[in-house]
UniProtKB/Swiss-Prot annotation:
Keywords: Disulfide bond, Glycoprotein, Lipid-binding, Lysosome, Secreted, Signal. This is Mammalian ependymin-related protein 1. One of its GO terms (molecular function) is calcium ion binding. Disulfide bonds join 54-184, 100-234, 125-222. The lineage of its organism: Eukaryota, Metazoa, Chordata, Craniata, Vertebrata. The gene is EPDR1. One of its GO terms (biological process) is cell-matrix adhesion.
């Protein structure tokens, strides 16, 4: 039965995905049946009845914006997602001058159980063990359908569906995923704990396929990688 780890930040180890400012799922098992709960599903599309999760693309590239409650910050990154080979590459983007902010590249190879953290400026490399199993970026088959609605306005809108890990009409969700009805592209994933949003990730500029598979190959400096994680902040 499909399972979710506790928090969605980077599809695997929570620490690993927090490092990359990515998405991960980390809040236990989903126990829905892929159907609208009582009272749900009456959005823009009206009463939709039973719904089945769509199948998200297996290989794509795009961009993401992640909000972390623990820091109160937003971070941006380029993302290469290869579900077929269970690997992800995250490249921090600089959108504004942030004093003493280090930018990193993250290469997560789940079949090998390792993550490489590479500082963009110096190519200094850390090699970190991934302790959590691969968790694909998709809608688990046992998710609960919440709603269908349109984003945007007249002539410029897209229809999306909202899914969650809510078990019944009387329980609260800890994960919400929004995916397009057409092609099942990820739009947003939100993770909550104790009724507060702790992680929220938006995906955009998605293109199917991996333009350059070599992005998953660590640089030569990783042959002598250190085992400790590097800090995102300057050391001085």
């Amino acid at each position: 039965m499909p399972r979710r780890a506790p928090l969605r930040v980077a599809r695997g180890s929570l620490d690993a995905w927090l490092l990359g400012g990515l998405w991960v799922c980390a809040l236990g098992c989903l126990c829905g049946v892929g159907m609208a709960a009582p009272g749900a599903g009456a959005g823009a599309g009206g009463s939709l009845g039973a719904q089945r999760p769509c199948q998200a693309p297996q290989q794509w590239e795009g961009r993401q914006v992640l909000y972390r409650q623990s820091t109160g910050r937003y971070s941006r990154a380029l993302l290469s997602y290869d579900g077929l080979n269970q690997r992800v590459r995250v490249l921090d983007e600089r959108k504004a001058l942030i004093p003493c902010k280090r930018l990193f590249e993250y290469i997560l190879l789940y079949k090998d159980g390792v993550m490489f953290q590479i500082e963009q400026a110096t190519k200094q490399c850390s090699k970190i063990t991934l302790t959590e199993p691969w968790d694909p970026l998709d809608i688990p088959q046992n998710s609960t359908f919440e709603d269908q609605y349109s984003i945007g306005g007249p002539q410029e809108q897209i229809t999306v569906q909202e899914w969650s890990d809510r078990k019944s009409a009387r329980s609260y969700e800890t994960w919400i995923g929004i995916y397009t009805v057409k092609d099942c592209y990820p739009v947003q994933e939100t993770v909550t704990k104790n009724y507060s949003v702790i992680l929220s990730t938006r995906f955009f500029d998605i293109q199917l396929g991996i333009k350059d598979p070599s992005v998953f190959i660590p640089p030569s400096t990783c042959q002598t990688a250190q085992p400790e994680r590097m800090s995102e902040e300057c050391s001085w």
